[in-house]
């Protein structure tokens, strides 16, 4: 059993003094006390301790494009062509190497859990690997090496657009039918449960988008997902681009949100990623369903997607979570800050999300999205902690409760996942100095 002591820590939406956190052998919080001094043998954490960030949307291999796509202008759709090129060259071995480095960067930045929206399932020509879960297991092994908690969202991807088959470059994403995808998903769940303990790696479901899952397949997918039980997370890219909305309306007469509602896919298990271009009816439907909305501010800014109606969605009853998506940066604090900054730009008003609400989006919102017992320093939750420096050049003078408005990942001093220190003083417990991780990232991007 490990006991941590922090001079200041985030408990129940505020900063408390002199906090002692006892973790059991399963890596969960067994006891929390505030207003107590350290005891002999306690591990003293530096700075101000917050719950670890929960990254609710990741495409690990997109990290290969960071800083390499900005000299030609374009849009989301031209960027996508570059992304397909990277997807085409992935193998299980290279994907594991890439994801290990990316997940290590996440942990060092303060993300302690990640939902990986994964659709590169098969060989480039669409045939299965001899090990049918080779790509998925590569991600699971990468998460274990990096020390991050993984929700592996196995994605259904069947068409390139409404009424259009997958292109040659998309062949490795598809299973041929919703039934075949569900069969493979069920087998993957069984395999992961056999090899990984609960909370380390878990399996969820994703529909890539309404344009990538034919209307006739939505009912099959909905029934199959429901059969897995209420705890199975379901994620979908939703209304990221106006062109998707226009095509959906032309093909079905519904917006993407309305189409999901028509097929029984709205509900508390659903995480709608981006949700950038919504009608008032869409917002009301998502709020009434108690859905989670995963905003990815750095990616949405990088790709010129737009600013989603996060404030209106929260007011309607939705939960807000955060994701790093294509990893233009990996920084939960900056991601949270950009959520508020986007709202300020769109509304002309400050304080649309308070610092406490931004911390909640970075932590509790992601817990709702992944179904994991994380995001809070409380009894029963996993003991995932990040220690933030309140005295750096960026944070000096900031109030402890407002560090989310000034700190960056460079101010993360120590990261604990499951009661074990994974990163401290620029060194990863398994992978060594973070400079080595950086060299790996540089080499795989070439």
State what each model feature region is.
Residues 262-269, 311-391, 406:
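His/Asp/Glu-enriched, well-ordered alpha-helical/loop segment
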Residues 67-68, 242-254, 282-287, 304-313, ...:
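Histidine/acidic-residue-rich catalytic or RNA/ligand-binding cores of hydrolases
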Residues 51-63, 233-240:
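Histidine-centered catalytic micro-motifs
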Residues 125-273:
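Metal-coordinating catalytic core of metallo-dependent amide/deamination hydrolases
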